[in-house]
A protein has these predicted regions:
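Active-site nucleophile and cofactor-binding loops and adjacent substrate-binding regions
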Residues: 94-103, 120-129, 202-208, 234-239, ...
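Claisen-condensing/thiolase-fold acyl-transfer catalytic domains that form or cleave C-C bonds
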Residues: 237-248, 252, 321-389, 436
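Positively charged, low-complexity intrinsically disordered leader regions
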Residues: 1-119
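Small/polar-residue-rich loop-to-helix segments that shape phosphate-bearing ligand pockets
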Residues: 145-229, 265, 271-318, 324
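Buried hydrophobic positions in well-ordered alpha/beta secondary-structure cores of metabolic enzymes
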Residues: 65, 90, 102, 127, ...
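A short, small-residue-rich loop immediately preceding and capping a beta-strand
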Residues: 113-136, 140-150, 229-245, 260, ...
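Alpha-helix C-terminal capping segments
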Residues: 108-117, 131-143, 248-254, 348-358
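Active-site/ligand-binding loops adjacent to catalytic centers
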Residues: 63, 185-193, 252-338, 380-468
Length: 470
């Protein structure tokens, strides 16, 4: 019997396809209402933290160096009030085999795929995760397919995504490059069904749990090196897995560090817009992913996402494109380190936040990534100019995404801007209710939403009262 391969036909089979491609029956975690058993789902990986460390270390993933940025710290202190200016550190995740922290996510997923007998892995990603999956698959002797959203309707590709395709292909993956739009998820599902490969999604428990080793390492390294945990850890935020995994690892280490999410401000640019696709100079760690995925994590390519950042986030800040480009140059010229845009998003935020903190405190940027070719600032700026973006020096707060990139004319103008956390939390609650409009909200649902938002049952009740649902 021929299967219905129309868009609606494939979408009607998505849960079955996902179950076969991941080996997880997500239905067993459901309550039948709003809540589900998140911790039970995370335990579905079947691996302890120690086992995950062993898996990662066996392929050269993890144990990345911690570097103190003394010169950037000194610069921030010159701009800060007397006695302020925390010490700035980075966890150099670019030292992983594929050049980013996502090797940690991929190592677990690929190991599990091979253990279950899958012949290959597939991932839908335009970013560093594709290179990470390709790298780990090559080491494991598995086939690898990466599906990218790369081009606009005119066939013009974003330089950073094209560079990542190059890297994936260099590591042995087959890369399918698609234009912006809903076809990506459709193609992803058809490939999973046709090949029988493992879904190495960013958002499975395997992938998110893999980042727990990063958070755990951070706590152990700083206790040994400085005699205490970091005071603040800044995580570049897009889909939320980076922050979720890091925070869970810190919790397992017993750390009490403040967790700050940082994203590039792309307000006004729609990520699924063909005309706006090439108006941005950042393809990850931006608000176009960060805000939607924070306020409704289950919009991903699995039934229930393991990345649930609002459970762990204490603060959410944004920085502008010009500020990240500036700090990228500053890192290279002052510290002798040339790194890519994702980690430098968090670094721009950390540079600003450090000036609020005492000199004896520690702030850590928990990732770096490789740079080069299309990821480098020069081709990104050339591409922006070709797309009509006004590039100049001035006050970055005057920057309009899709129209201008404004470098700070003085480093004192780099300012992380806080986003209202309660607004995010209320948005998540509203989105959860919208998914289950006919459900009578139970006490367990209230407790679930309190955990989802890192608040209290009283906060959830107040938010529900605001939308006339209680």
């Amino acid at each position: 019997m021929n299967k219905d391969m129309t868009y609606s036909g494939v979408m009607s089979r998505k849960n079955e396809i996902m179950k076969n491609a991941i080996g997880i029956d997500y239905g067993i975690f459901e309550s039948g209402t709003i809540g589900f058993d998140y911790e039970k789902m995370m335990r579905e990986t079947g691996y302890t933290l120690e086992e995950m460390q062993k898996i990662q270390y066996s392929t050269g993933v993890g144990k990345t160096p911690v570097l103190e940025l003394r010169n950037l710290t000194e610069l921030s202190r010159k701009l800060a009030p007397k006695g302020k200016g925390a010490r700035i550190f980075i966890k150099d995740e670019a030292a992983n085999p594929s050049g980013s922290f996502k090797a940690r996510r991929a190592a677990n997923a690929v190991y599990h795929a091979k253990k279950l007998g899958y012949k290959g892995v597939i991932a839908a990603t335009s970013g560093n995760y594709g290179a990470a999956v390709a790298s780990q698959a090559a080491m494991a002797g598995l086939k690898c397919i990466i599906v990218q959203e790369c081009y606009d309707s005119k066939g013009v590709g974003q330089p950073e995504i094209i560079e990542k395709a190059r890297k994936c292909e260099a590591l042995g993956a087959e890369v399918l490059q698609l234009s912006v739009g809903p076809e990506l998820f459709y193609k992803f599902l058809t490939l999973l069904e046709e090949t029988g490969y493992f879904n190495a999604s960013l958002y499975t428990p395997f992938g998110i749990a893999g980042v727990e080793t990063l958070g755990y390492e951070l706590a152990m390294e700083f206790r040994e090196r400085e005699g205490k945990d970091p005071d603040v850890i800044v995580c570049s935020n897009a889909g939320g897995g980076n922050l979720t995994g890091t925070a869970r690892g810190l919790i397992k280490a017993g750390a009490q560090s403040q967790i700050v999410a940082a994203s590039v401000n792309l307000k006004g640019l729609h990520m699924a817009s063909d005309s706006q696709f090439n108006k941005k100079s950042f393809t990850t760690s931006h608000t176009g992913f960060g805000m939607p995925f924070a306020t409704w994590p289950d919009r991903s390519d699995v039934p229930r996402s393991a990345a649930r950042p609002l459970r762990y986030m204490d603060r959410y800040v944004t920085v502008n494109q010009g500020e990240v480009f500036y700090i990228t140059e500053a890192l290279a010229s002052l510290e002798g380190l040339e790194k890519g845009p994702a980690g430098n998003t968090a670094l721009a935020a950390a540079f600003s936040i450090a000036q609020e903190m005492d000199e004896n405190e520690i702030i850590v940027v928990q990732e770096t990534e490789y740079t080069g070719a299309g990821k480098h600032i020069q081709p990104q700026l050339s591409f922006a100019r070709d797309n009509g973006i006004d590039i100049r020096f001035g006050n970055p707060q005057d920057e309009i995404p899709g129209e201008s990139i404004i470098f700070p004319e003085h480093p004192s103008l780099i300012k992380a801007v806080d986003f209202d956390m309660d607004k995010l939390r209320k948005s998540l609650i509203k989105n959860a209710i919208a998914q289950f409009p006919d459900v009578v909200i139970s006490d367990s649902d209230l407790e679930f939403l309190a955990k989802e938002t890192k608040t209290s049952v009283e906060f959830v009740k107040s938010a529900l009262d605001g939308i006339n649902k209680i």
